[in-house]
């Protein structure tokens, strides 16, 4: 099993219900493709280090997953890239010797 950490930033002007639905949707994408969510953190609204698409703040989310292959992370990245509500994301494969 491989462990990945996914961090993504949601635009700050999204409504609370839409933001919660977005998080559930992307967690569902991960689990539907065979990933197991180990940990999920909502860091809340934070200031960005630099402006992204004219936004100075964003809602930060961190998800750690276990998966056999990269299908779940590939699908997450594909859909996050075309989603206007996610302004930045990164997927990191954690070292196996931890």
From Swiss-Prot:
Task: Please give the InterPro entries that the UniProt record associates with this protein.
Answer: Ribosomal_bS6, Ribosomal_bS6_sf, Ribosomal_S6_plastid/chlpt, Transl_elong_EF1B/ribsomal_bS6
Looking at the UniProt record for this protein, which Gene Ontology cellular component terms does it annotate, in alphabetical order? cytoplasm; ribonucleoprotein complex; ribosome
Q: Is Flavoprotein among this UniProt entry's keywords?
A: no
Q: Which Gene3D superfamilies match?
A: 3.30.70.60
Q: Name one GO biological process term.
A: translation
Q: What does this protein do?
A: Binds together with bS18 to 16S ribosomal RNA.
Q: What is this protein called?
A: Small ribosomal subunit protein bS6
Give the organism, scientific name: Staphylococcus carnosus (strain TM300)
Provide the gene name from the record: rpsF
